[in-house]
Amino acid sequence: MTLILGIDPGSRITGFGVVRETARGCEYVASGCIRTGNGPLHERLHVVFRSVREVIRTHGPTALSIEQVFMARNADSALKLGQARGAAIVAAMEEGLSVAEYTASQVKQAVVGTGGADKQQVQMMVMHLLKLTQKPQIDASDALAIALCHAHTQQSLVPHGLVGARRRGGRLRL
């Protein structure tokens, strides 16, 4: 039984989702959004760090799965997103968690079956897979999807003997 923490990083809103991986599939544990407010960036990053560390200490996951940065139209936004990712990753590393990174299309492919799914499709599949009766906030549902992606990826690698096969820099390299 493994607990996986998924993080959808952001400098203003960071979604988190915790799932328990069992022999019967994945079960919902917790989810929510970390709202950092409107202060200076360094204060918001500190909120992300402290809050992710608190989620880890509360729920005790052994793995963190996080979305990779994508380069959009706005380089400043991508830099802030990367810094928020860094704050979450450092919190996880300080608590001894393994870290796995996934692209948005990998997450969508693993959860919905197509890398081009929209946020509502991801949200509906997360609800279905985790048997949720209410829609989680969109950032929280993205984080749950990232955790589910990690669980599905690990399950598909086990039969091939690839889990932990080659790790460099904290990422599984295939």
From Swiss-Prot:
PROSITE patterns: RUVC
Chief place of localization: cytoplasm
Reactions it catalyzes: Endonucleolytic cleavage at a junction such as a reciprocal single-stranded crossover between two homologous DNA duplexes (Holliday junction)
Keyword Acyltransferase: no
Enzyme class: hydrolase
Effect noted on mutating D139N: Does not cleave HJ DNA
Positions that bind Mg(2+) 1: D8, D139
GO MF terms held by the record: crossover junction DNA endonuclease activity; DNA binding; magnesium ion binding
GO biological process: one example: DNA recombination
InterPro entries according to UniProt: RNaseH-like_sf, RNaseH_sf, X-over_junc_endoDNase_Mg_BS, X-over_junc_endoDNase_RuvC
Effect of R73A: Does not cleave HJ DNA, binds DNA
Effect on the protein of changing R50A: Nearly wild-type cleavage of HJ DNA
TM stretches of this protein: none
Pfam families: RuvC
More details: Probably part of a ruvC-ruvA-ruvB operon. Does not seem to belong to the SOS regulon, no LexA binding site has been identified in the promoter region.
Membership in a protein family: Belongs to the RuvC family.
HAMAP family: RuvC (MF_00034)
Name of the molecule in the record: Crossover junction endodeoxyribonuclease RuvC
Record organism: Pseudomonas aeruginosa (strain ATCC 15692 / DSM 22644 / CIP 104116 / JCM 14847 / LMG 12228 / 1C / PRS 101 / PAO1)
Gene from which this protein is expressed: ruvC
